[in-house]
């Protein structure tokens, strides 16, 4: 690439300075050039599933799960009574009282 510098050196006006400096703007002009930038490969790591648990008296994958399910209740209302919804459990953790069926 060929460049030229149109800035002329400053002429000292007085004693010779210790360093060459001038207050005139110095512009450097170069020919147009093409630059190709290739991005490097990016590795993105996505988080795995977030597992959360709530303290409940349930047994999963056991032959006794049917028996345990019959004694589970929320504020005295059996979970398997046919009129149970999740608002009972969630309201229990939020501090409000469950409504009976």
UniProtKB/Swiss-Prot annotation:
Does the keyword Lyase feature in the UniProt annotation?
Answer: no
What are the record's GO terms for cellular component? intermediate filament
Keywords, ordered alphabetically: Acetylation, Keratin
Where N-acetylserine occurs along the chain?
A: 2
The source's superkingdom equals Eukaryota
Q: Which InterPro entries match?
A: Keratin
**Record lineage:** Eukaryota, Metazoa, Chordata, Craniata, Vertebrata
The molecular function GO annotations come to: structural constituent of cytoskeleton
Subunit arrangement? The avian keratins (F-ker, S-ker, C-ker and B-ker) are a complex mixture of very similar polypeptides.
One family from Pfam that matches here is Keratin
Sequence similarity: Belongs to the avian keratin family.
Which protein is depicted? Answer: Feather keratin Cos2-3
């Amino acid at each position: 690439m060929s460049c030229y510098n149109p800035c002329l050196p400053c002429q000292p006006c007085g004693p010779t300075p210790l360093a060459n400096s001038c207050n005139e703007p110095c512009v450097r002009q170069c020919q147009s050039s093409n630059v190709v930038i290739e991005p490097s490969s990016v590795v993105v790591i996505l988080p795995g599933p977030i597992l959360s648990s709530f303290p409940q008296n349930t047994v999963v994958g056991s032959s006794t799960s049917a028996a345990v399910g019959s004694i589970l209740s929320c504020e005295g209302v059996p979970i398997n009574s046919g009129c149970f919804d999740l608002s009972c459990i969630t309201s229990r953790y939020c501090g409000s009282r469950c409504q009976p069926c």
